[in-house]
Amino acid sequence: MGSGKGEDTLIGFFGRVSYGFADKYNVLLSIRREGSSKFGENNKWGSFPSVSLGWTISNEKFMEGTRSWLDNLKLRAGFGVTGVIPGARYLSLTTWALGSPYYYDNGTWKQGLKVDHNPKPHQKWEKSTEYNVGIDFAVLGDRIWGSIDLYHKKTVDMLWEYDVPVPPNLYPRTMANVGEMRNQGIEVAINAIPVRTNDFEWKTTATFAHNATKLLSLSNDLYETANRHYIAYLGEPISLSTQIMEVGKPLGQWYGLKSVGVSENGLWMIENPATGEIVEFNDNMLTDKETWYQNLGNAIPKVNVGWSNTLKYKNFDLNMQFTGQFGFKILNEARAYYQNNAVTYNRLKDAAEAPYGDGNVLKPAQKQTFVSYYLSNGNFFKLSNLTLGYNIPLKENKYIKAARVYASADNVFTITAYNGLDPELSNGDPQYSGIDQRDKYPTIHTYTFGLNVTF
């Protein structure tokens, strides 16, 4: 048990100028100037400009022949810089912690103080520079409208921890602004009103997003580290990494032993990625990663989709919200720990079954470990929310202006092949993406009934 106290300060200024001409051309300029106590004394302030340009092509004279069906066509382009503030408060300062060495004073051993963080007066903002182009459109009397955006974002001065010599440093590891990463992708949103009559209307929106990441660098002339790092470690007793973060490659790469079956001895059968040879599991495979480990897929969805529908009939309305993610794999951490006969507690019933359906069951000799068997296709499409409402007809009065009753359900159903509780994950740490943690509180179905009254 312990307690702590800390404080930090953030101050910012913002300015914006916009200009439009002839209802065709638009310019927006903005700048933010922010200062944070979390940065080093030499870099507490950051400036973040942005520029966006717009051209409404549909208002040009040469587009007059399209106005019977084209309501809006606008081309957009933008550039902007944003800054990221770290979560920890005192990364730029020397910090101390209680611990060894102990010293003997007047018959008692007393705990000493030790440095546990190097000062970094030059610590600065992580900055992301983004370029984007997009198009807005509307056709057929605004019955169909939407947008398409392409973006390219580069983040520099990302914080990473490095080994440093002692002395001159007080602590053998330090954080520094060195890393670089790239994100690029596409976002599409399409809206439509397929049906509209006096009593009935159906409005629908579909969204599509794809993002690709690439780690560009983790080293510079002053701070150097390996181009490959093993991350996303599982806890005891497995204590193994499940992913790699590698310069020149996308984030979220599953990396480990590829299992293809179970031997008659009840041990995993592992594929050698170089030769294709199938070998019975042994502990040396866990340390000889260069020989036995291989890429097992990615933890980050390639595609995110959404689909919302609103249907109105007289005083009734029905809203449906669908979401989906595709092109990724999930690590079922609970199965990695408990679908194994080496454990005597919380063992899953599936541990008594053959993982690959060939009659060979894992035996107690097979230690808990991470293999590809515990990765599952994470694709899903779910009805996230369903709401049915009714607007109560009211006689005109001075007390109540409107009244509506509704029933709503969240997390209604999910279409997926995933063998865990819920494929929609929300891990806060990007270095643990794709892990369905064994101690996660399960997603619940929620049902709500309500009454809204406007006075």
What are these regions (language model features)?
Residues 113-115, 285-290, 363-371:
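Short glycine/proline-rich turn/loop motifs
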Residues 1-241, 374-455:
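Extracellular/periplasmic, surface-exposed regions of secreted and cell-surface proteins
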Residues 176-299, 312, 325-328, 334:
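Gram-negative outer-membrane beta-barrel transporters
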Residues 290-292, 303-304, 316, 367-373:
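Short, flexible active-site loops
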Residues 86-102, 221-229, 250, 257-258, ...:
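Membrane-proximal, glycine/serine-rich, low-complexity loop/turn segments characteristic
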Residues 55, 123, 261, 266, ...:
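Tryptophan-centric aromatic hotspots in well-structured domains and transmembrane helices
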Residues 301-315, 384-389:
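Conserved SET/PR-domain catalytic core that frames the SAM/AdoMet-binding pocket
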Residues 36, 325-412:
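Extracytoplasmic gating/loop element in the C-terminal half of outer-membrane beta-barrel translocons
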